[in-house]
Every structure is written in structure tokens, then in C-alpha cells.
């Protein structure tokens, strides 16, 4: 290897720890290597602090923490400020890399071949343009990453970085400052991009709560109105004294349809659940229409006498009162048939029922009301006794919202709440026995 006269003498020296056979890219025919003079190497203490290796290139355990290493790396030393050896570009086949853009190398066997502190460059015979300044992500990688691959390619092509000053004017101070400004500008634009991405993610989460956000104001604001509560928070129309439809039963019958001028031609009814017509087209109520459809004749207006099941037996009479009609035939202790009234009386009092208590008619009960109807009636009566005035007044509403605010999945973040809760509730309000963390979250 011949060294030209205009090149510095340290280019011809080879460091023992960085050999051509040990370099990961030594198999590439187009890549050349230039090395630093041993007198320009960093001190052993600085190498230990910065890169976790000793002066011979062997890895050692870190002596200082990452914070100390980041502090030391922020300020360059005066020993190796201008001498830097940069390997050439790996491949030129990347689609967004051209000759006018600057880029730092991705692979480096020795960590001090790429230094983020050098401000001047050395012109040497390299097949491609190089950059003194690493990408914006190198400042974070060099502080906490001890791998030899200190810098990586940026995710997008750097559009604002100026060409390498080593190609145009190697010793110009003005171009160096211009590159420094451009590098800072690129880093600021990258930081703005990261802020925009984070603000987009926040705005997508905030849209679930009905609020919008922008890149400059990531904290959501309260909407100008209180959104309508869903059916999961309040029972539907039960607090307002309406029909308790949420309990799964009907407390009142179906609404009867009544049209002006309509009247059943059979019974004269003016309201019915469903109006029907007979064969001639006249209106019939639902009952008369069904009766006519099933029996083929008009529904009788007088109710027929109720037939008593097992009321009449041929030749059967009560052994006590001699009646022949009853709802249920029983037997006394002797085995004789008795009517239902005499049998129950004897069962309760152990004496025969007196004849003075005999009645001509049979008193029956209305057993049509089922147990479900009774339950629905009780629930409806309890809801009517609920005070309507305290349903949606501000005190009751704020108390209800503070007690159920821990149900919301976004209640852990104060700016994600869709409705504002009072910061200091009135002293007359009393909170239920909730968990302390949920109360703190509700108070916001």
C-alpha cells in the first residue's frame, strides 16, 4: 500500500485490534479501510467510560452507569476532536441514497471509528460520500447502547441534510456551521414528527369519549353539552314514574285502539285491541269477530251461566245440607259425599256445618290474576312512591355520577372523562362505601 505525500502519515498505520480479516465487511471487494494513528487513539479511561472496552479493544464490564456515560459523551475532549476515520458506504443499491445526500455507516467494527463529536472531516479516497453527523437517533443509541453498531439508518430519507462538506470544501468553517444548522433542523423536524404521531394516537383514544384533540393540544377538552346517558346507567323511564319496562313484565294491558266513529255492530263496543269485519263489511270488536269466525254465529250479548265442574252427579246430594250442586265433592269421616262447603267446615271445626249457613248461590272467587301480575303491581306501586322531585336535580345527578364514574374504562385518566364532575361537592352530599381509589378517581 502506497501512501501519497498529501495524505497524513497516520493513514498508513494499522491498529492491531482492527484487522482486515476481523472486519465484518472485509469480504466486500469495493470497501477500503483507513485507520487512526496510535497516538490519536482515545485514552484507556475514556474508552472504558464511553464504550465498555479497554485500550486493546477487549470488552469489559461497564465501569460507569449509562447516565454517567451519556454525560461524558455530551462533551467532547480535546485529545481526539478532529482526527476521525470513517469507513466508506456499504452498498449503493438503496433506493433513496444518492451522491448528493450524506449518510453515516451502519456497520463499524471499532466503536471510535464513528464519533459524534468531530466537527471537521478528513478528505480521503472513499468510493462514496460520507457524513460527519450521525442520524438523529444516534444520540439516544450512543448513551445507552454498548453494541459496536452505534448508529442505524433513519427510517425515512433525510431530505433536509446538506451534502457532505468533506466533498465540497474540506476546510471551510462556514460549511461546517451550515451542516450543523441543517443537522439540528433535521433533528427538530424528526421530533415534531414523533409529537404528531403521539398526538394522533391520543386523539384516536380521545374520540371514544366524544372529544377531539390536535397536535398542539393533546389534552382533550370537555364537550359543550352533557351527552345522553345510555340505558345501562339508568333504568329506562322508571325514575320518571313511567311504566317499568326494564323489569320484563307488563303492568297494564295493551293499548286499546279506538277510531272515531267505529262501533261494534254486535255489542256496541267503541274500543278494542283490534277491529275486525264480518261478512258484510261491518266493524266488529276483537271478541265478537273471533267468536263469529270460530262459531259461525254472532257472539251472545248475555253471559252464559258458568258451568260447574263435577257439580251435578246423578243422584248425588250432600249428606249434611242435601244440596245437589257444588264446585267440589268431598267425603266425611263415614265416607258419605258432602259438598265443598260442608266438607271444609267439618275439616276446620270438627263439627258439622249448621244448616242456617246454607246459601242458594255458590260464592266464587276471581282467580284470573296470576302471581306475575301481583309482582308487577307491587313493583309499580313502589316506583310511584319514589320521589320524582329528586330524580334529576343537580345534587342527585352529581352524586350519581361520582358514584358510578369508576365504571368508565377511561376513568384512570382525568382528561379522558367525557362529562365534568364537581371538584368540591356540597357538604350535604354523602358518598356510599366505595373503594378509596375509585373515589379519588371520581373526584378527578
UniProtKB/Swiss-Prot annotation:
SMART domains: ZnF_GATA (SM00401). GO terms for molecular function: cis-regulatory region sequence-specific DNA binding; DNA-binding transcription activator activity, RNA polymerase II-specific; DNA-binding transcription factor activity, RNA polymerase II-specific; DNA-binding transcription repressor activity, RNA polymerase II-specific; E-box binding; HMG box domain binding; identical protein binding; interleukin-2 receptor binding. It is found in: Nucleus. Residues 1-29, 123-181, 195-215, 362-390, 413-444 are annotated as: Disordered. It holds the Pfam family GATA. One of its GO terms (biological process) is cellular response to interleukin-4. It comes from the Eukaryota. Expressed only in definitive (adult) erythrocytes within the red cell lineage, and is also abundantly expressed in T-lymphocytes and brain. Residues 137-147, 163-176, 413-430 have a biased composition (Low complexity). Residues 201-215 have a biased composition (Polar residues). Residues 365-378 have a biased composition (Basic residues). A zinc finger (GATA-type) spans 264-288, 318-342. GO terms for cellular component: chromatin; nucleoplasm; nucleus. Keywords: Activator, DNA-binding, Metal-binding, Nucleus, Repeat, Transcription, Transcription regulation, Zinc, Zinc-finger. PROSITE patterns: GATA_ZN_FINGER_1, GATA_ZN_FINGER_2. PANTHER family: TRANS-ACTING T-CELL-SPECIFIC TRANSCRIPTION FACTOR GATA-3, TRANSCRIPTION FACTOR GATA FAMILY MEMBER. Transcriptional activator which probably serves as a general switch factor for cell-specific development. It binds to DNA sites with the consensus sequence 5'-[AT]GATA[AG]-3' within regulatory regions of genes. Binds DNA via the 2 GATA-type zinc fingers. This is GATA-binding factor 3. It comes from Gallus gallus (Chicken). The lineage of its organism: Eukaryota, Metazoa, Chordata, Craniata, Vertebrata.
